């Protein structure tokens, strides 16, 4: 039996901020099951999460993690830290290792004491703290190539956003299980900001316009 699956997601750290981006396509075997699949979730005021893999498993994790974050805030009066949230998720996944959640997850957050934090987790609870960038899903090999070529830890947030979108766009062009739009979030000391489709489209148009100008200049040089 085929289940709905999510695909390419990207996370990166730059200039004291975390950027998360995902595509919107959910596939079921060779069928595009959903063109508006939600793969980017706000867990807390300073934490967001991306999903790739089984949609049902991932949504169950999101519900559980969101409830735990709210419960933590009720008990302590503080927001749960990104590290504590990632560790909790790692423990949940590991405790279910014999019947694993079929999903890969990226947690991005901002710790008011330690700054931007990024974690990747596998279905068995393996957790890595990422110091630069990470990607998950079937389109991740393509996304990694773009990230490797363009990443700079000290790049401003605006350039980091463009790089994340370029990585997603490249994956969507080459991976059949990725596509149908992009979701984007930036996490800073101000909190989680999830971008509207119109804002993302505007940035993508700027990237495309800049790319066309570079191509035109190269063509002119060759013709000379």
From Swiss-Prot:
It is an enzyme of class 3 (hydrolase). The active site is at 7 (nucleophile). GO terms for molecular function: threonine-type endopeptidase activity. It catalyses: Cleavage of peptide bonds with very broad specificity. Pfam families: Proteasome. Disulfide bonds: none annotated. It is found in: Cytoplasm. Keywords: Autocatalytic cleavage, Cytoplasm, Hydrolase, Protease, Proteasome, Threonine protease, Zymogen. The formation of the proteasomal ATPase PAN-20S proteasome complex, via the docking of the C-termini of PAN into the intersubunit pockets in the alpha-rings, triggers opening of the gate for substrate entry. Interconversion between the open-gate and close-gate conformations leads to a dynamic regulation of the 20S proteasome proteolysis activity. Its main location: cytoplasm. Residues 1-6 form a propeptide. Gene3D superfamilies: Glutamine Phosphoribosylpyrophosphate, subunit 1, domain 1. GO terms for cellular component: cytoplasm; proteasome core complex, beta-subunit complex. GO terms for biological process: proteasomal protein catabolic process. Belongs to the peptidase T1B family. Component of the proteasome core, a large protease complex with broad specificity involved in protein degradation. The 20S proteasome core is composed of 14 alpha and 14 beta subunits that assemble into four stacked heptameric rings, resulting in a barrel-shaped structure. The two inner rings, each composed of seven catalytic beta subunits, are sandwiched by two outer rings, each composed of seven alpha subunits. The catalytic chamber with the active sites is on the inside of the barrel. Has a gated structure, the ends of the cylinder being occluded by the N-termini of the alpha-subunits. Is capped at one or both ends by the proteasome regulatory ATPase, PAN. This is Proteasome subunit beta. It comes from Methanocaldococcus fervens (strain DSM 4213 / JCM 15782 / AG86).
């Amino acid at each position: 039996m085929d289940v709905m699956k999510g695909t390419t997601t990207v996370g990166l750290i730059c200039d004291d901020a975390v950027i998360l981006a995902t595509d919107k396509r959910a596939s079921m075997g060779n069928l595009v099951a959903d063109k508006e699949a939600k793969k980017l979730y706000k867990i807390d005021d300073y934490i967001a999460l991306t999903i790739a893999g089984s949609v049902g498993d991932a949504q169950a994790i999101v519900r559980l993690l969101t409830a735990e974050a709210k419960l933590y805030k009720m008990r302590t009066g503080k927001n749960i830290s990104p590290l504590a949230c990632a560790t909790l998720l790692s423990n949940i996944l590991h405790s279910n290792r014999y019947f694993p959640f079929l999903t890969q997850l990226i947690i991005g957050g901002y710790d008011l004491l330690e700054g931007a934090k990024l974690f990747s987790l596998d279905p068995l609870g393996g957790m890595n703290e990422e110091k630069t960038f990470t990607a998950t899903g079937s389109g991740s090999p393509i996304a990694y190539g773009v990230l490797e070529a363009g990443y700079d830890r000290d790049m401003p947030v605006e350039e980091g956003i463009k790089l994340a979108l370029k990585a997603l766009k490249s994956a969507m062009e080459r991976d059949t299980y990725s596509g149908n739009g992009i979701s984007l979030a930036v996490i800073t000391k101000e909190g989680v900001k999830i971008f509207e489709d119109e804002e993302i489209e505007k940035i993508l148009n700027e990237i495309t316009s800049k790319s066309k100008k570079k191509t035109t200049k190269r063509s002119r040089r060759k013709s000379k």
